[in-house]
């Protein structure tokens, strides 16, 4: 069902002469596998199907008129026979009683009617006639070509054409994602290169860019190899890895400042680099337990990329930079020294700083508990093209097909069951309108009622005499009644096996029927309404709301993520306790947790949505925070170099994640902001615990 809806594009033209423009443009862009300007792709096939379905697809309102007064129906039929101006869908020898002229299929299940003369579906809205063209995209089409086709149509016809379809939003998101991934990657590389040049002064430091190229290439290739595809948001988020990729290199280079680099010096910190990788990889590996393919792809890209970076840093980079000599620029020194002085200041007032931190955490927690429902809203995750949205709303008004998110699923489905269910819901003002199979097709019972009316009318002499009085032969009339009685009563499976009815199959699958509906009542109002629940129970139906289901799904992932985060902290603590003492491990784990709570509280106080992407951002940040703690506790490196390594690597990582906050996609924005903010807090909170026994921070050398 979703595939059918997402691959279909609707075009509405206010001039019938323009309906062929879609086919003409498709010759240029080749994105549509079928384009229907009429009721069917094959007119003769459509007419034959109308014949087969002339009773099963008879409009219910017309059936009710026949039931209410069959004599009046036959009187009107005689008038129609004598009126040469009335258009007959089928020849009289096939459909003497002209039931096909009242087929619900001629209205396409919405506001549209069928113009048999021009073989086109049309509707009138605000005193203007609109002609419909439906196009179905190839399974593998070029989204950019779809946007080009739409641009060409709008450029030539302007508001004379309305275009609607879910694929438009996907194509626009794809284009936006590609543009963002390109500029974010370029900007991240340029800023990282600028930081490295400022910190190490010599151009040879740009060899670190080879680490980025090598690692990211393997990461993206690995994702495509494992999943067979890659989400555009995965590519965007992978741009943020640029800062993390050079972390291993910067940790090593921090111990080689102001001296000639020897390739053998890497051995001093290999153990710590491996620990760093394991902890960060565990942070990303937790994403694999998410149900979201996007997060799983991010995990795979990140783990492979960081592993490649680790190997490159250990086995290649030391030999590339062997013999190099790096000193820090004056500009970077000034910035770095100001950072060290700020650490001195914070350590001098450590208890006061921790008190302020605790107050902010308490305030943020109170607001979070008071205002948050812990539920996610899918509407906050993406940006929507306003022009496409405007056309979609207009198209919904014109067609009467707004694709509401409310729907019912009926077990052991029959059309009769659906029809009775809808009648009860409408009578109780629980729904306003609906879309389902009972809108278009009659139930087995209703078809039998129609057959019974013809059977009784055949034996009704007054009705037969009405036809004889017009000059028709009695035997001919009786033969036509016998033809009408010979039609087959069709169940839902037989109906949907006919080509013209096949598109309605997405309303019925595996003995389950789907009914879409609109209601003035909210999701919660319907869920709390006993009458609504009793009616659904009576007819084996269940209520779903697509948006609420997605929100609930995301909320479940978020709660799952919180559990994963706690597991991650425990795993990080376990790894730390192997390398360091239990006391140090507890101290650092607490510092990381405190920093994350501080960052979350800032989100809460500033009313920034803590959605699932923010939660996973905090999970990742926690792993990176433990990495920094490992470097701080590495006594093989003097304290000043430890600070330098952490500050430089944090700076490149923060820049990479800050760039994500420029994304038009809210999910990417919150992910980038949550990590960047957490890393910034780590720079100031972690030293308070890593060097807890110092009375003050490190004094910069003169």
List PLM regions with ranges.
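Juxtamembrane extramembrane loops of integral membrane proteins
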Residues: 1-50, 384-385, 391-427
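Short, flexible, solvent-exposed loop/turn segments with mixed acidic/basic and small polar residues
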Residues: 1-4, 121-125, 369-373, 394-401, ...
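Membrane-embedded transmembrane helical bundles of large multi-pass transporters/channels
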Residues: 148, 155-376, 547-702
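Juxtamembrane segments of multi-pass membrane proteins
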Residues: 351-352, 357-469
